[in-house]
């Protein structure tokens, strides 16, 4: 139960960092990513790869928890499964929105006259 509380605290901290960045409270997106532990290197590509790997890992973990609950594992509760599934869903939705913004920015740059 203590691990669940610290996990929720970690997610809450990441959400607060993203909210501060959206409101202009964080100087740069790299600072928010560094604070959340998502970026390990200074390049955009490595930050994207780390974020995608984390999203994928969260999804795999949630699926593993769901399968364990389905077969009746004693150490897996429905609450844990639901929280992990929601964390994976939120991460995926965030990644999808980042992708949409990147595609939109790319299209805007491509439409600029040189």
From Swiss-Prot:
GO terms for cellular component: bacterial-type flagellum basal body. It holds the Pfam family FliE. Signal peptide: none annotated. GO terms for biological process: bacterial-type flagellum-dependent cell motility. GO terms for molecular function: cytoskeletal motor activity; structural molecule activity. It is found in: Bacterial flagellum basal body. Keywords: Bacterial flagellum. The keyword Disulfide bond does not apply. Belongs to the FliE family. This is Flagellar hook-basal body complex protein FliE. The gene is fliE.
